[in-house]
């Protein structure tokens, strides 16, 4: 925590093709070793694959997928009287988006397709259909929160 007050959030510029800040964040998360051009190509190619395979607008599929991935609740460890409790808490909107993108990319990277553009497109289409590893991660997180509902009164 900083000693000199609050640090302002840096604003992300919307991407040039879809004019969306969320797509910019996706590109920034896909990026490795500062290679933004490569990351943009991967994302835009994945969106092109989605357009071809589904016949729907890629942004629609992307937004639907993100809504199916982003968690509403998560658990946070809290130490009380020598015991650690998993306390369910609501997730702030900014963190919801961050976790959604993180889980989407983790699930994409674990997939079996040869190219990242295909893995990302596949995971986005699966998530839009409420299947896939990223959606399962969200369901598991919600189950953990539900199972530990009894400790909700220890909330921060």
Swiss-Prot record:
It comes from the Bacteria. The keyword Ribosomal protein applies. InterPro entries: Ribosomal_uS7, Ribosomal_uS7_bac/org-type, Ribosomal_uS7_CS, Ribosomal_uS7_dom, Ribosomal_uS7_dom_sf. Keywords: Ribonucleoprotein, Ribosomal protein, RNA-binding, rRNA-binding, tRNA-binding. Disulfide bonds: none annotated. One of its GO terms (molecular function) is rRNA binding. PROSITE patterns: RIBOSOMAL_S7. GO terms for cellular component: small ribosomal subunit. One of its GO terms (biological process) is translation. SUPFAM superfamilies: Ribosomal protein S7. Gene3D superfamilies: Ribosomal protein S7 domain. Part of the 30S ribosomal subunit. Contacts proteins S9 and S11. One of the primary rRNA binding proteins, it binds directly to 16S rRNA where it nucleates assembly of the head domain of the 30S subunit. Is located at the subunit interface close to the decoding center, probably blocks exit of the E-site tRNA. Belongs to the universal ribosomal protein uS7 family. This is Small ribosomal subunit protein uS7. It comes from Clostridium perfringens (strain 13 / Type A).
């Amino acid at each position: 925590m900083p000693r000199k007050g609050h640090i302002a959030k840096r604003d992300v510029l919307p991407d040039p093709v879809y004019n969306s800040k969320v797509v910019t964040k996706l590109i920034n998360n896909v990026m490795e070793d500062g290679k933004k051009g490569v990351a943009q190509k991967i994302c835009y190619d994945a969106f092109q694959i989605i357009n071809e395979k589904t016949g729907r607008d890629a942004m629609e599929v992307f937004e639907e997928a993100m809504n199916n991935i982003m968690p509403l609740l998560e658990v946070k460890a809290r130490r009380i009287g020598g015991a650690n409790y998993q306390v369910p808490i609501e997730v702030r909107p900014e963190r919801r988006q961050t976790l959604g993108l993180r889980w989407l990319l983790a699930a994409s990277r674990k997939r079996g397709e040869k190219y990242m553009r295909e893995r990302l497109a596949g995971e986005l289409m699966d998530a839009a259909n409420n299947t896939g590893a990223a959606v399962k991660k969200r369901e598991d997180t919600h189950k953990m929160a539900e199972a530990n509902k009894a400790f909700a009164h220890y909330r921060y």
